[in-house]
């Protein structure tokens, strides 16, 4: 195994496991401790991992800095549009829906083309898209409160007080990360608001692209097995199969 193959193998191992011990790499690749330490330094300099005491941690596992709303609109757009179209097919005339924040949900809002719907959202960009479609039979409501500027979603006591009184036939939402059956986001405020909407929804659909699977974020707000189904792309079959061990994935 040459150096480039070894670096590639170490990167695959740390990304798969999240964190890895130096001695695991030494034994797995049959190389010296000093060689592994040099390789870890090189991979850290490339931004692939972060060295920790006795090993390394994948930089793709934990989302230390939440990505801006603008940047999210440049990532996995084809996959997100595919997910949005599949999610739209689950909506029926007469539904009362809750749309959570997120760029994938914004794309779902663009796809919605029904005659009779009531849609409630706490996300300003989602509301703006839906407002253009409003008619006497297609009603759109925005939940107010304290706005998180990075997601342009309303959270906090005012938003939660309104949500507590509402009931939804279906909820469509996204998340920053899904790992070991837990669905995660970046703040406690947003997590609690999502939990309230979930508890008041009959059917619950999580919209995620494959890059979110195996990552972690600050706090979890639900478990996959509490949901109706997950809507995702099929770019990584292994990740799809991972999700299927917890919950149905919409075909």
From Swiss-Prot:
Residues 3-58 form the HTH deoR-type domain. GO terms for molecular function: DNA binding; DNA-binding transcription factor activity. InterPro entries: Carb_Metab_HTH_regulators, DeoR-like_C, DeoR_HTH, NagB/RpiA_transferase-like, Tscrpt_reg_HTH_DeoR_CS, WH-like_DNA-bd_sf, WH_DNA-bd_sf. Keywords: DNA-binding, Lactose metabolism, Repressor, Transcription, Transcription regulation. Residues 20-39 bind DNA. It holds the Pfam family HTH_DeoR. GO terms for biological process: lactose metabolic process. Coiled coil: none annotated. Repressor of the lactose catabolism operon. Galactose-6-phosphate is the inducer. This is Lactose phosphotransferase system repressor.
């Amino acid at each position: 195994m040459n150096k480039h193959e070894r670096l590639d193998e170490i990167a695959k191992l740390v990304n798969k496991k999240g964190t890895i011990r130096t001695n695991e790499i030494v034994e797995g690749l049959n190389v010296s401790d000093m060689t592994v330490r040099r390789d870890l330094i090189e991979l850290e300099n490339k931004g692939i991992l972060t060295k920790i005491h006795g090993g390394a941690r994948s930089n793709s596992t934990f989302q230390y800095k939440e990505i801006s709303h603008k940047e999210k609109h440049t990532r996995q757009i084809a996959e997100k549009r595919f997910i949005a179209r599949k999610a739209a097919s689950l909506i029926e005339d007469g539904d009362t829906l809750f749309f959570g924040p997120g760029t994938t949900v914004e794309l779902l809002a663009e796809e919605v083309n029904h005659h009779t719907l009531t849609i409630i959202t706490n996300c300003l960009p989602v509301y703006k898209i839906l407002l253009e479609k409003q008619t006497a039979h297609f009603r759109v409501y925005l939940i107010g409160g304290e706005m998180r500027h990075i997601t342009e979603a309303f959270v906090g006591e005012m938003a939660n007080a309104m949500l507590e009184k509402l009931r939804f036939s279906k909820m469509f939402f996204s998340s920053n990360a899904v790992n070991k059956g837990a669905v995660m986001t970046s703040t406690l405020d947003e997590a609690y608001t999502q939990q309230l909407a979930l508890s008041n929804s009959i059917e619950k659909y999580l919209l995620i692209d494959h890059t979110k699977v195996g990552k972690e974020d600050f706090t979890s707000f639900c478990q996959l097995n509490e949901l109706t189904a997950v809507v995702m792309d099929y770019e990584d079959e292994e990740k799809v199969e991972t999700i299927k061990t917890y919950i149905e994935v919409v075909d």
